[in-house]
Amino acid sequence: MTTHEPRTVRAPRGPHKTAKGWIQEAAKRMLMNNLDPEVAEHPESLVVYGGRGKAARNWEAFDHIVATLDRLENDETLLVQSGKPVAVLRTHEWAPRVLIANSNLVPHWANWETFDKLDQAGLMMYGQMTAGSWIYIGTQGILQGTYETFAGAAQKHFGGSLKGTITVTAGLGGMGGAQPLAVKLAGGVSITIEIDPTRIRKRLETRYLDEVADNLQDAIARAEGYKAQGVARSIGVQGNAAELVPQLVEMNWTPDLLTDQTSAHDPMWGYIPPVNADEDAGKLRSEHAEEYRQRAYAAMAAHVRAMLELQKRGAVTFDYGNNLRQRAFEAGVEDAFSYPGFVPAFIRDSFCEGRGPFRWVALSGDPQDIYATDKALLELFPEDERLQSWLTYAADQIAFQGLPARICWLGYKERDRAAKLFNDMVKDGRVKAPIVIGRDHLDAGSVASPYRETEAMKDGSDAVSDWPLLNFGVGIASGASWMSFHHGGGVGLGFSQHSGLVIVADGTDEAAKKLSRALTNDPGMGVIRHADAGYDHALDVARERGIDLPSLGIKDHA
């Protein structure tokens, strides 16, 4: 196709490639999989998730990327600048086949206003995290991490289970859509507010949401009934969180657990303010942009004020990394940061172990390949109770979106073992085609985000972004198949920088070497980052597992 028009995209399946190597073929299939209608939020606009997180800058750029990947040699590297292929360079076979940089701006200009001007001029693209790095796998991609968060809340506040509790949250997009099922897995009842009825339907169809209430009062009545019965159940309700959460205050009804995962990171294209019955939010945004922005900020302020009041009344309240607190603070809510972020509250100990999201995709397109890897991992890590529980549940309950895929959380000296296993399975034919291995940018050592992953670091190094740059370099030096460096994922422009790694297990001996190196060093950066910040748990892991940290007097004993 040469007209560069929107069209339905679906990744090729099977053991035969049209590119010159499996890495190039994998990159092409994963780019296309990001835009599969089962996967992407708005594929016709190249938007994958997270407000306007895109896979390619425009359809012309998409076509050029696909064509270039098909002709790319095994010792060449494609450079992609904010979703546009800009060069092919001769490198070497251990170099990444693709290097991606998305949304990066010099710090003084790292804001939405500058980005929007460049975006409108066709010069930039917002890549979110895994949208522009071609490793998004649908809502499952965040599900176990979301479960880890709610399980952490259960452990800290509710005796280890959310049974007999009600969680209220908002947002059923690509990220937030994991919340209802995650709360259910942790044993609880949830009410999730979502303004877009198509997103509600999508979560029902993919079994991430159980049922939809007629209104907020109906949702509360249903939730109270399930809570009394000790039943885990998820309820959706259509509405605007900036209106419904304050209604909870007015109704004098307080949930047990409260958070939010609307797209507050992007005030213009993510968070939708309340509008009058005779108004259209999209039209208001396009015709009266400044009024829309002001309304969005006012709505976020009202939303957070209500959350703060519910916190005072006893709701365990946390921020889910969408920068809602910062937006409310900018709108005049001085105590917006009175409730914590989810990472310091529940996840940091895992990061100290280099433990984070590890995902893989079957390029064959055959679900049986994923089920085979599930079984193999259960045998490889019999002592990991969380992994055993998760993979057993996932194999039975999780609906695939696009190419069959799986995610689990693994740490330092675990991811490399899993990758070796997968490569052996490709080599001996236990799976029908190569396997792509990647992760979210939300990981132990790959991101600087002071209101999310690096919030409240022990040594005050929240905003130091040397670490994701080092992570990016380490992946390149260690044999990754493609690497990405992005700005603004999760919390919006000006508030984060982060790196992504993807590597292909194609069954070859060379792949085995790359997998071992890359998937040891990448999670190792998480241990290193937290050990350097002074976390005792990370220091213990570094000593026990043999990481050479010269400034801390720890040497590799492996």
Curated annotation (Swiss-Prot):
UniProt entry keywords in alphabetical sequence: Cytoplasm, Histidine metabolism, Lyase, NAD
Cofactor note: Binds 1 NAD(+) per subunit.
Catalytic reaction equation(s): 4-imidazolone-5-propanoate = trans-urocanate + H2O
Cellular localization per UniProt: Cytoplasm
Protein EC: 4.2.1.49
CC cofactor: NAD(+)
GO MF entries: urocanate hydratase activity
Keyword Cytoplasm assigned: yes
InterPro entries: Urocanase (IPR055351), Urocanase-like (IPR023637), Urocanase_C (IPR035401), Urocanase_central_sf (IPR038364), Urocanase_CS (IPR023636), Urocanase_N (IPR035400), Urocanase_Rossmann-like (IPR035085), Urocanase_sf (IPR036190)
NCBIfam families tied to this protein: hutU, PRK05414.1
Functional summary from the UniProt entry: Catalyzes the conversion of urocanate to 4-imidazolone-5-propionate.
Family classification: Belongs to the urocanase family.
Protein name: Urocanate hydratase
